[in-house]
Amino acid sequence: ILYNKDTDYYYLFLSFGGLDASGGYNIRVARSKNSDGPYEDASGNAMIDAKGEAGSFFDDEAIKDYGTKLIGNFAITNEQDIPVGGYVSPGHNSAYYDEVEDKYYIIFHARFPNKGEQNEVRVHQLFFNSDGWPVVAPLRYAGESLAALETEDIAGDYRFYKMDNAIDSEYEEELALTLTATHLVYGQGGGYWKSSELPNESSLVLNFTEYKGYFIKQWDEVNGVETTTFSGMSAEGKALFGIKKTED
């Protein structure tokens, strides 16, 4: 459980699913004004109701629609559609606030596309949007901080990933989208992007759904360069990642 003084909410971070490569491990969150609850997700579901029938055990189907999913399986592919990054079964998490840096982090272990049960610990930065929900920076932490970005930093071709509620071994769907300097979005979906309510916050509207979050300058370790990412969440609690392409 993590308290945020700015939102005045307590956040309950959870892992759903099984931790092996086929278990569909994923990280979710719920919040409450009181440390002892009751906790609800972004859809208003009470987390105390997240359970299977009496006598059941590991009933993923019964609980899959509880908890706001922050991150699950996703594969970053290259131009030949070969996975070169991303995570499989990220979970077993801890959320942490660094008072000195005034930054929030989430620490978890993860497996990787096409690498079986090999696993490592990862640290990603957390940000809170104007709806009071945390969003996870799509790439591992490398010292980045939020800052105002120029239009040319944001515009470009992206890979986007929409998190669904499934608890399975499938990857989240990858969408190829282009963000233009005139704030339009097109490709495997359409919409626009704009500034939002909080400092440095942005909204990306995709197929009539608004995702509030942040464009972030992050280190792309696969290609060894800095790139722009986006992490946002809809009012219904659907998380969206975007990673700007950097390869030639």
Segments from the language model and where they lie:
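Carbohydrate-active catalytic/glycan-binding domains of CAZyme proteins
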Residues: 1-248
